[in-house]
Amino acid sequence: FGTKTGSDPDNLKTAYYAFFSDLDNAQQLINDYIKSAPNNNTFADADILTQGGTYPEWIKFSNSLRLRLAMRISNVDRTKAEYEAKKALDPNNGGVLELSSEIIQVSGKNGYTNPLGEINKGWLEVHMNANMESYLLGYEDPRTQKYFEKSIEAYENEIDDNGNYVYGETRKDINYYGQYKGIRQGTGTTHNYYKGHSISTVTPNTPAILMTAAEVWFLRAEAALRGYVDAG
């Protein structure tokens, strides 16, 4: 943000107010188009974010974004946060994401590659943290298999004449094969030692999720707790 190259960046208040203004303008354009061509659905062919590519979906996405932004400024600008939250949750403005099927995500259908998936599968750099292992396994969370893969075999830490790691014999003291295993934060042990630990299930073909109805329900609950609205 700023007026020209090299200018001082806008402060946070200016930036957030600009976000709300952008949402106002975007929704007005969509609503105007709906009125002029109610039976057209020209978004569908090029839409890589919503499930059906319909105008109502984009209105819901816009309102949900507005609610997210409102909650982010609620501790520093209560008046503006309350105003924007009420606007987002006003049913006359088109509603927000409510159903589990209403997911805003970048689809891989048009060649998009999930960058986290590349880092995870290509570099093996997205591992389960030991704290996450403790929570998920301690509470027997059924979502564990959705988040992480089970550990694979680990190998001895060997280096060839050129200083590169090479696979050696399977470590005999590693007994977590086929289990969920996280990495302890702050460890100074080399990467190869932890190479077999649980990695994320995200792949290069996994859609990149930007917003879900689950988040919006939490935002609505926060708005209600703050006394902004009856958030349902």
Language model region names:
Residues F1-G232:
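Structured, solvent-exposed acidic/aromatic patches
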